[in-house]
């Protein structure tokens, strides 16, 4: 298995798809990277030369924030919003949707499993 940016990328997949295993690299960025480095997107990872792998690694690390750097930047942005107490920071702190989605229904992923609240007991006659 080839390693790029600290990630094992699968040997049997086309390089265009295999690059998407790296956090911060999607299909569009993978295509841009391959076009800039002059590597055929249809070639399999196992068929890449060491020279091509080095070129890919240098291009990705030089032009984009990927993997750990990107994760750290995202975490820092969230912490900063929480610290300055802006609306998005308050939503992050409460564990609610941040970007204006409805919460009366839905938003279960963000809110977690339902917690049942005890209701009124029936009056006995």
From Swiss-Prot:
<keyword id="KW-0820">tRNA-binding</keyword>
<feature type="region of interest" description="Disordered">
    <location>
        <begin position="90"/>
        <end position="125"/>
    </location>
</feature>
<dbReference type="GO" id="GO:0005829">
    <property type="term" value="C:cytosol"/>
</dbReference>
<dbReference type="GO" id="GO:0006412">
    <property type="term" value="P:translation"/>
</dbReference>
<keyword id="KW-0687">Ribonucleoprotein</keyword>
<keyword id="KW-0699">rRNA-binding</keyword>
<dbReference type="InterPro" id="IPR010979">
    <property type="entry name" value="Ribosomal_uS13-like_H2TH"/>
</dbReference>
<keyword id="KW-0694">RNA-binding</keyword>
<comment type="similarity">
    <text>Belongs to the universal ribosomal protein uS13 family.</text>
</comment>
<dbReference type="Pfam" id="PF00416">
    <property type="entry name" value="Ribosomal_S13"/>
</dbReference>
<comment type="subunit">
    <text>Part of the 30S ribosomal subunit. Forms a loose heterodimer with protein S19. Forms two bridges to the 50S subunit in the 70S ribosome.</text>
</comment>
<dbReference type="InterPro" id="IPR018269">
    <property type="entry name" value="Ribosomal_uS13_CS"/>
</dbReference>
<keyword id="KW-0689">Ribosomal protein</keyword>
<dbReference type="GO" id="GO:0015935">
    <property type="term" value="C:small ribosomal subunit"/>
</dbReference>
<protein>
    <recommendedName>
        <fullName>Small ribosomal subunit protein uS13</fullName>
    </recommendedName>
</protein>
<comment type="function">
    <text>Located at the top of the head of the 30S subunit, it contacts several helices of the 16S rRNA. In the 70S ribosome it contacts the 23S rRNA (bridge B1a) and protein L5 of the 50S subunit (bridge B1b), connecting the 2 subunits; these bridges are implicated in subunit movement. Contacts the tRNAs in the A and P-sites.</text>
</comment>
<dbReference type="GO" id="GO:0019843">
    <property type="term" value="F:rRNA binding"/>
</dbReference>
<dbReference type="InterPro" id="IPR019980">
    <property type="entry name" value="Ribosomal_uS13_bac-type"/>
</dbReference>
<dbReference type="InterPro" id="IPR027437">
    <property type="entry name" value="Rbsml_uS13_C"/>
</dbReference>
<dbReference type="InterPro" id="IPR001892">
    <property type="entry name" value="Ribosomal_uS13"/>
</dbReference>
<dbReference type="GO" id="GO:0000049">
    <property type="term" value="F:tRNA binding"/>
</dbReference>
<dbReference type="GO" id="GO:0003735">
    <property type="term" value="F:structural constituent of ribosome"/>
</dbReference>
């Amino acid at each position: 298995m080839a390693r790029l940016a600290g990630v094992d990328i699968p040997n049997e997949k086309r390089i265009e798809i295999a690059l998407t295993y790296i956090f911060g690299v999607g299909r569009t960025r993978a295509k841009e990277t391959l076009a800039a480095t002059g590597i055929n997107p249809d070639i399999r990872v196992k068929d890449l030369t060491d020279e091509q792998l080095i070129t890919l690694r240098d291009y990705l690390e030089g032009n984009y924030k990927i993997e750990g750097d990107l994760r750290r930047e995202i975490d820092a942005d969230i912490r900063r919003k929480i610290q300055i107490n802006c609306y998005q920071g308050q939503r992050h702190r409460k564990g609610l949707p941040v970007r204006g989605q409805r919460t009366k229904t839905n938003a279960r992923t963000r809110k977690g499993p339902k917690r049942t609240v005890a209701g009124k007991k029936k009056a006995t006659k």
